[in-house]
Amino acid sequence: MTTKVAIIGSGNIGTDLMFKIQRLSQTLEVAALVGIDPESDGLQRAGRLGIPITADGVAGLLDIPGFDQISIVFDATSARAHVANAAALEPFGKQLVDLTPAAIGPYVVPAVNLEENLAARNVNMVTCGGQATIPMVAAVSHVAPVAYAEIVASIASRSAGPGTRANIDEFTETTSKAIEVVGGAHRGKAIIVLNPADPPLIMRDTILCLIGDADHDAIRDSVHRRVAEVSEYVPGYRLKQDVQITTVTDDVPLSTLGRVSQ
């Protein structure tokens, strides 16, 4: 018995999610793909797969036959659109998974805090950069207090559709906040780079944590354990290089970090 889901947003993220569920999931079934452009590539491809589609947004989803059988709705639109979508769907008691930076519900990073948010009706998946990096910040903060954490997410420009590009500011704000709330850093900062390299590169992220005295081996062990946990649900997730730890003595000025973390 599969759980029926709907996906709002027929752009890159929504379409990719649709194919991942169709090809890989044994527990979920895509019962609808929702967009606003009847000529969008995502809706066309879903139609060819026999998946019910609508180009009338969330209003069209409410009218799709079998809507009452849908249990989970993934929203892959934009931060602003999700606010309206969540309000429209609230009376129907659906589980909402927010793939935008709107963050109406709690931030959820599965390897860190999934269990404590299972009862939430609207969960926010932060951002792609947040999902990749926050587990590492949390791994460090599990061993030692993190005064400041900074992440740089570099993704292929081709993978960023109009929705992602329109949400760059929200991306940095939401990810920065989640670094603090979920990652455990006192202050967080996020930077996104859309790399136009061709052929497109695989997403890479860099994480910097500023901590006090700590057991270096314990930090490395914590990071490696968390990498193993994430790789269980994100195939291919790995450290590109081993954990680097640099001791900063009192006579070395932290000119940049000092200004940011004050």
Swiss-Prot record:
EC number: 1.2.1.10
Catalytic activity reported: acetaldehyde + NAD(+) + CoA = acetyl-CoA + NADH + H(+)
Transmembrane segments: none
Domain of life: Bacteria
Originating organism: Rhodococcus jostii (strain RHA1)
Gene Ontology MF annotations: acetaldehyde dehydrogenase (acetylating) activity; NAD binding
Active site: C128 (acyl-thioester intermediate)
Keywords: Aromatic hydrocarbons catabolism, NAD, Oxidoreductase, Plasmid
Stated family: Belongs to the acetaldehyde dehydrogenase family.
Annotated GO biological process: catabolic process
Enzyme class, broadest EC rank: oxidoreductase
NCBIfam families: ac_ald_DH_ac, PRK08300.1
Pfam families: AcetDehyd-dimer, Semialdhyde_dh
Protein name: Acetaldehyde dehydrogenase 7
Binding residues annotated for NAD(+), in chain numbering: S10, G11, N12, I13, S159, A160, G161, P162, G163, T164, R165, A166, N167
